[in-house]
């Protein structure tokens, strides 16, 4: 997939995603697409936003299939409508990283990927990419 060049606005926030370390948001963007958004001043810091964007660009350059991604704007006005319990305030407004929500996707490990029967899939390229970006999420303990 590819990077979205335009900076999109977050038009609506549906929920906070509890599974993520950064507690990202599930949103509707100005283009009508649903996305997962990592916002500034999250509990992992702002470096996460840059890391996600750079990783997306690297994946795109070496033909790793990733969801469309880019930068979006989360406004003070949207933040102020969110539940107090989420712990977000205007410090979390600003430029964010987003990736389009792919509803049919599932997390996978290298063990599961090793049996993929698709000639267009390149496991070696994915392994190199994961090592390059220090991704440990696909490691299930049974791979090198």
Enumerate the predicted regions with their spans:
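Conserved kinase catalytic-core segment
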Residues: 105, 110-144
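Conserved ATP-binding subdomain of kinase catalytic cores across diverse folds
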Residues: 2-110, 135-136
């Amino acid at each position: 997939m590819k990077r979205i060049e335009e900076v999109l606005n977050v038009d609506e926030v549906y929920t906070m995603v509890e599974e993520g370390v950064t507690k990202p948001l599930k949103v509707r963007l100005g283009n009508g697409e649903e996305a997962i958004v990592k916002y500034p001043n999250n509990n992992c810091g702002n470096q996460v936003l840059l890391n996600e964007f750079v990783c997306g660009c690297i994946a795109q350059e070496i033909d790793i299939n990733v969801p469309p991604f880019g930068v979006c704007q989360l406004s003070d006005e949207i933040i102020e409508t969110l539940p107090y319990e989420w712990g977000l305030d205007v410090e979390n407004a600003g430029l964010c990283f987003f990736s389009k929500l792919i509803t049919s996707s599932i997390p996978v490990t290298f063990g599961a990927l090793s049996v993929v029967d698709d000639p267009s899939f390149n496991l070696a390229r994915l392994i190199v990419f994961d090592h390059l970006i220090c991704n440990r999420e696909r490691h299930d303990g049974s791979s090198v």
